[in-house]
Regions:
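Elongated, amphipathic alpha-helical interaction scaffolds
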Residues: 1-251
Length: 251
């Protein structure tokens, strides 16, 4: 299963796939996020605001996929995490990624503002009043077969029932947005992510897979190599992968 999740993570890193994922999950296929308006940003983080270099043995944090999306109206970071099984700490993990990204942004603001901030509040904050953080949106794509039964909010990782109600209202929340592949409508997707989702939704039945392939033979015949490889990995179709490699060897 680790190999499958690693493959899915690499696939989501493609700009056209990440854009299609957001459009299909959030906008019913409307092309709101354009791949051409996505640019690469840092995926690796050091924790905290310290400028000190971390120890070589320290573990670095890496997002599955993140790109900056810009248009004439806004600039926002779009991230995605792939999960092949429910994860009990996923709200905290996504929050940790977001905090690490905001910390990176603050380090940059502090660096470019060094020596320029004169007022007391700005000097103390190491941030000008006109400086702003870039917002982050993160979605979790769950491609497991069992229903998601893990927390979707930070509060669901806590025991809050006995806490004073006024204090309870002041506990900060962090919510994640989980999209189960089994529940997605593949027609909302325009790239070959459509075929990947369509086939994975039918992975429990070889007959249904064959029916889907016959029905969508035209699109499948034009499927790119990366998606073909992904389908072979996700559906454990080693024989198809072997056939493709043999075909390439023979020219």
């Amino acid at each position: 299963m680790g190999k499958q999740n690693d493959a899915f993570t690499a696939y989501l890193g493609r700009a056209e796939v990440l854009a299609d994922l957001y459009n299909g999950c959030l906008y019913q296929g409307e092309e709101v996020v354009q791949a051409g308006n996505l640019c690469e940003v840092q995926q690796f983080y050091q924790q905290g605001l310290s400028e000190r270099v971390k120890r070589p043995t320290a573990r670095r944090r890496e997002r599955d996929a993140i790109r900056a999306f810009w248009n004439e109206k806004s600039y926002v970071l779009l991230a995605a995490e792939a999960q092949n099984q429910p994860h009990l700490t996923i709200p905290f993990r996504c929050m940790e990624y977001d905090l690490a990204e905001y910390a990176r942004q603050l380090r940059y603001i502090r660096l470019k503002s060094e020596g320029k901030l004169k007022t007391g509040v700005e000097y103390l904050s190491k941030m000008g009043r006109k400086d702003h953080l870039t917002p982050i949106v993160t979605i979790v794509l769950y491609h497991g077969t069992e229903p998601w039964d893990a927390p979707k909010k930070l509060s669901e990782m806590m025991e809050l029932e006995e806490i004073d109600p006024i204090l309870k209202q002041m506990v900060q929340e962090y919510q994640i947005y989980v999209f189960s592949l089994e529940e997605l409508q593949e027609e909302y997707f325009q790239t070959n992510l459509r075929e990947l989702i369509g086939l994975m939704k039918r992975r429990s039945s070889k007959t249904k897979i064959q029916e889907y392939c016959r029905k969508h033979a035209d699109r499948i015949s034009r499927m790119d190599v990366a998606t073909y490889d992904m389908i072979c990995v996700m559906l454990n179709l080693k024989e198809l992968q072997d056939k493709k490699e043999k075909y390439l060897e023979n020219g």
